[in-house]
């Protein structure tokens, strides 16, 4: 779940009904508590208005998702893949009595200073950390597109999209 939607109650409720691992990214200001709160919420049962298999409205009841983790994506201010940051993220989860303190590190976004070419630097550092400590994290994320850059999707201008370039 992305940095901007980690605070969304709807996303937290939907995740609570999934029986698979789901990651919540720290927000773009670097706050771990928001992702921790999202994990806490998704761990619990929820009841909300949804749509049934026939397309009608219904009340959906979930049992909670115990397989959530935090994704460190950096922030608009700094990176957060270093040892101190990973420790702080895990402490945020531990201090809130979460039984799992799983962290995945995103090599892109704020951790690459929004330059895809820096992902290899982040990955090299993480390889060293994982070699020293197998519990450093549960994995890494890399961002890859066929062509570099990003583009906006503008209503009615789908034909102007460039192939293989991220739509943001």
Question: Predicted regions: what is each one?
Answer:
Residues 105:
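Conserved, mostly hydrophobic/aromatic
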Residues 96-98, 132-135:
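Short helix-capping segments at alpha-helix termini
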Residues 91-95, 163-167:
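Catalytic-site microenvironment of enzymes
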Residues 1-88, 109-110, 114-125, 129-131, ...:
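Active-site-facing alpha/beta catalytic cores
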Residues 60-62, 94-98:
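Acidic (Asp/Glu)-rich catalytic clusters
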């Amino acid at each position: 779940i992305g940095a901007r939607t980690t605070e969304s109650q709807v996303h937290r409720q939907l995740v609570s009904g999934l029986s698979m691992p789901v990651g919540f990214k720290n927000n773009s200001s670097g706050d771990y508590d928001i992702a921790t709160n999202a994990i806490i919420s998704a761990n619990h049962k929820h009841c909300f208005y949804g749509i049934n298999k026939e397309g009608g409205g219904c009340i959906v009841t979930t049992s909670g998702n115990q397989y959530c983790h935090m994704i460190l994506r950096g922030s608009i201010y700094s990176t957060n893949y270093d040892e101190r940051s990973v420790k702080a993220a895990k402490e945020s989860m531990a201090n809130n009595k979460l039984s799992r303190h799983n962290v995945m590190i995103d090599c892109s976004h704020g951790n690459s200073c929004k330059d895809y070419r820096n992902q290899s630097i982040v990955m090299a550092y993480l390889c060293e950390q994982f070699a020293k400590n197998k519990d450093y994290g549960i994995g890494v994320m890399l961002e890859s597109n066929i062509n570099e850059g990003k583009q906006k999707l503008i209503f009615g201008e789908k034909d102007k999209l460039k192939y293989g370039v991220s739509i943001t």
